[in-house]
């Protein structure tokens, strides 16, 4: 079994789409629009086959998102190398995104940066490698 895709509601569909395309090389479909409900969405495909659906609809409520809360808290991207982590961290910081920590090697062996992503929806963890789960 595998997770087929993960979905999240966002305020600015095109800005969020552009964020994932620019920094993570996502490929985007042409989008979907339901004229009866106003619902819109894009599917973003990443090079390893993972998919993220970003969605929007009229009259959504948007509450303040505390970084310490229950529920989904971050998306982690394995970008392949320490150099790529460093490069993306610098690029995202220069583009105005907040770097919360890193780049650094964590106690469990990840080389990562933690960045507050577009719309502060989640932390974006950039990782150089994945460790095995025990």
Regions found by a protein language model. Give the residues of each.
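Exposed loop/turn and edge beta-strand positions of beta-sandwich/beta-sheet ligand-binding modules
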Residues: 38, 71, 109
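Short, flexible turn/loop "capping" segments at secondary-structure junctions
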Residues: 65-69
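A short, acidic/glycine-rich surface segment
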Residues: 29-30, 54, 59-64, 101
């Amino acid at each position: 079994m595998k997770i087929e895709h993960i979905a999240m509601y966002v305020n600015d569909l095109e800005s969020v789409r552009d964020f994932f395309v620019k920094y993570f090389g996502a490929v985007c479909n042409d989008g979907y629009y339901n004229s009866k409900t106003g619902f819109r969405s894009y599917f973003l495909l990443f090079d390893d086959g993972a998919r993220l659906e970003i969605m929007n609809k009229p009259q959504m409520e948007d509450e303040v998102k505390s970084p310490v809360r229950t529920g989904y808290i971050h998306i982690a991207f394995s970008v392949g190398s320490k150099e790529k982590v460093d490069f993306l961290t610098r690029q995202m910081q220069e583009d105005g995104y907040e770097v919360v920590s890193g780049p650094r090697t964590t106690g469990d062996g990840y080389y990562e940066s933690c960045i507050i992503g577009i719309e502060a929806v989640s932390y974006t963890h950039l990782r150089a490698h994945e460790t095995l789960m025990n």
